[in-house]
């Protein structure tokens, strides 16, 4: 839609000059106004309203809308007014309509406007035919000029206040009625009367405009006074607020400083207490560490003394284990400076004539002792403080330890059962072996220190036995000194509990 870009009076004058319909579209910010504006911008509407239409678009919040609503009440927004030449609305569209409906309304307004135009033309022809004198043909021109002046006077007050608009509208209506009667005007009123009335109306309009300007000036003065008063009050209020805010900030700052000082004092006191406590704890720790160090030194000295004594005892005693060809063994202690012959004699007394004449040898390192070695000391032969020697029967090689049986069956059984018997004897001798009794009174005196050494050795062997027993505990069950294999029922028996009266509780 091609909207008129000037003010309402200019749009009215343009419509009057071209004899077109004056269209006023009052729009707002709501959705219906947007839809109606879209309908006005439609291509069909543009084509239908391209001729004989002068359209203007005003906003509901503008001053032009307020002035327009004083003459034509705006019932709803959006609204579209189609106003004819006489100022009478030909059509009013309230709300939003579609583009097709708007095109229909525009065609209807065009028909109404064309009918009114034809009626006015016929009236003019009849009036001209009824006039016969030259003066009568002159007076309509005067009336037309008066009518044009009156229309200008009616158009100018639209920019003024509503009261002057209504008053001027009444006068304009009277003059319009006079101007619409050209024959009566030529017969009843002379041209001078019309000029006087126009001058009088112009003077009244000027007076009212002057009054309005004075009222506007007074209102502006009052507004300025109110504005200055309000500004002063606002400045006073802001100054008071700033003073109160500054006062509160100073109080808050003072309170924070006091709290900080108190917090620093508390922290200093706590630091002093912590230092004193730490110093006391450090002193106690030092004393405890000194006591522990003294006790540790005493224990170390005692252990050193015990170690030296045990070393001396071990250096004076040689513990010899004799291993027999059948896998069994026995142990005895000898003085470290005793000759090897004494150990051989002890073995011969213990074994008897089972193996006949035999010799002694070590397996690690492999060494078979000769007759010269029997005269040497055990310490010199590196058999102190402990050693393991093997009895080798005479006439057998050193590698042959187990004697062969005469029968094949016994040989086979011996071969199969020998590892198990050897393991059993080794375990039994290791766990339950006791030193053999002294066989001579002369040897009893020499074996007394050796017994004490063997007891110390057995004490050292106790942890080893405990570890072996702990390892066996998973697969064996101990009942006194007897071990037997575990079964599934043993685990259930161990989980049973017993109450106070010796009855079993599952």
Swiss-Prot record:
Region (Disordered): 114-193, 437-506
Predominant location category: endoplasmic reticulum
Keywords: Endoplasmic reticulum, Membrane, Nucleus, Phosphoprotein, Unfolded protein response
Source species, domain of life: Eukaryota
Coiled-coil ranges (or none): none
Subcellular location: Endoplasmic reticulum membrane; Nucleus envelope
Ranges of compositional bias, category Polar residues: 114-136, 177-189, 496-506
Name of the protein in question: UBX domain-containing protein 4
Intramembrane ranges, chain numbering: 412-432
Record function comment: Involved in endoplasmic reticulum-associated protein degradation (ERAD). Acts as a platform to recruit both UBQLN1 and VCP to the ER during ERAD.
Chain ranges of the UBX domain: 313-391
GO biological process, alphabetically ordered: ERAD pathway; response to unfolded protein
Domains as described in the record: The UBX domain is required for interaction with VCP.
Phosphothreonine modification, residue list: 487
